[in-house]
Amino acid sequence: MRQDVSLLSTSGSQKNPLGNVKIAPGAVVCVESEIKGDVTIGPRTVVHPKARIYAEAGPIIIGEGNLIEEQAFIRNSFPENIAPDSDVEPKTMIIGTNNVFEVGCYSQAMKMGDNNVIESKAFVGRNVILTSGCIIGACCQVDTCEVIPENTVIYGSDCLRRVQTERPQPQTLQLDFLMKILPNYHHLKKTTKNISTPMKS
């Protein structure tokens, strides 16, 4: 049985030997998640099984207290007109604090502030900048080249927009619950000592 546990705990690194995954103490990252490339995960961030984080075109830095649910896909990919083997400067994807990536969402947004929610099966393209307090509604697709203003809600089959008065509340209680429960049922990726995530500006 011990052998099986050790195999599970190393499976992530075997999938991508060139990867450089740094997990801050206090983060909960399940081994069944798939993380490739240069990825830094901040404290109190929870990554569910089957979530995918691919740093292909440059590093991904994920801040504190983010919730990344099952089958969510965060990807720092190459632009469509650039081949993966071409010599381009790596661009860093930065995700702030207290963001929620719901089941089956797909985010390529290169810059994201704090307290945003990308709901189930929503898509956010790489040229979109999410500021803070935004909600991208379930199944909505946002693939424009724009900065989404703070507290914007995009919703419905026509991706209508409105501005809410308050930003979404951080999922503090849910994170606390998941940080207690997930380790009981899933093996976790090992944390990395002495890593620093960018401080809030």
From Swiss-Prot:
InterPro entries: DCTN6, Trimer_LpxA-like_sf. Coiled coil: none annotated. It is found in: Cytoplasm, Cytoskeleton; Chromosome, Centromere, Kinetochore. One of its GO terms (cellular component) is cytoplasm. CDD domains: LbH_Dynactin_6. Keywords: Centromere, Chromosome, Cytoplasm, Cytoskeleton, Kinetochore. Transmembrane segments: none annotated. It comes from the Eukaryota. Signal peptide: none annotated. Its main location: cytoplasm. Part of the dynactin complex that activates the molecular motor dynein for ultra-processive transport along microtubules. Belongs to the dynactin subunits 5/6 family. Dynactin subunit 6 subfamily. Member of the pointed-end complex of the dynactin shoulder complex which contains dctn4, dctn5 and dctn6 subunits and Actr10. Within the complex dctn6 forms a heterodimer with dctn5. Interacts with plk1. This is Dynactin subunit 6.
